[in-house]
């Protein structure tokens, strides 16, 4: 029987999510990869236990994480039954819907029918009565934003989720409309989940200003750029890498000379600070309190242990930030 580490809350940094009462760990664990049918169940269990023992209380999923679709939630539900059923109130769980999930016109995008059906399916797979956050996973130009946000409001009011969130709403005006519609309905938007890293700074073009103004938290997914910011691709493509195993999200054309030179420059900054490149990348994402948490993935427990050390590093100096801007802005 799993017994969590007694000191799990002593060393983790928790940050306030926007202007809410919610605190999230500086590093959260995403189950986008490595929790489907291709990853041994024992390895999944080791990742979850390692994270929780380090004070990581937030696990993030989506309805179509796998492979196949739904498998990450299904596997998490088995872990929930085995290890976490007596610790549910210590966990902050999220899932999402918005991308393709099942066949036909009602298994994708942002309709009320899709979102309500999806949360019901997710709760069954995850073996929980509710999630802490339910996100709309991406904007849907074909569905009125009032319908999509109305569905999130209904899900919260029905007790199937405690909070509403949005993800991949990169247009600042569109994000603001969604946030204000949720507020009008009486279910404030807790959090936005965008892609944000040293190699993708799109959210700095107005979105972070909106989140700050509206008091909405931000959790950055892919802060290590799907592994590019670990440095593992600087000397070629490892045979066991995700780029070889599954090239859908990280393609070989990302390894262009300009990107590789940027990564080498960032690695030099990290080494001068006594850090790994991944630790520098995570610390940089969290340099602004607008970003509540950095959402990491992991294939081995030691990756989680190393990444959490980013929270203990000395602050980045102004000179270091300027060097980083010169390499990435």
Give each language-model segment a name.
Residues 88-101, 193-195:
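A short, structured active-site edge motif that brings together acidic residues
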Residues 22-27, 55-57, 85-91, 128-132, ...:
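Short, well-ordered coil/turn segments that N-cap beta-strands
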Residues 1-91, 157:
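N-terminal binding-site loop/beta-alpha segment at the start of enzyme catalytic domains
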Residues 39-51, 110-126, 175-179:
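Short, acidic/polar
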Residues 2-11, 139-328:
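Beta/alpha (TIM)-barrel catalytic core signal, keyed to glycine-rich beta->alpha loops juxtaposed to Asp/Glu
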Residues 18-36, 94-107, 130, 135:
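N-terminal small/glycine-rich loop or linker at the start of catalytic domains
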Residues 123-143:
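Active-site groove signature of glycoside hydrolases
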Residues 39-43, 71, 75, 106-114, ...:
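Alpha-helix N-cap and loop-to-helix initiation/capping positions
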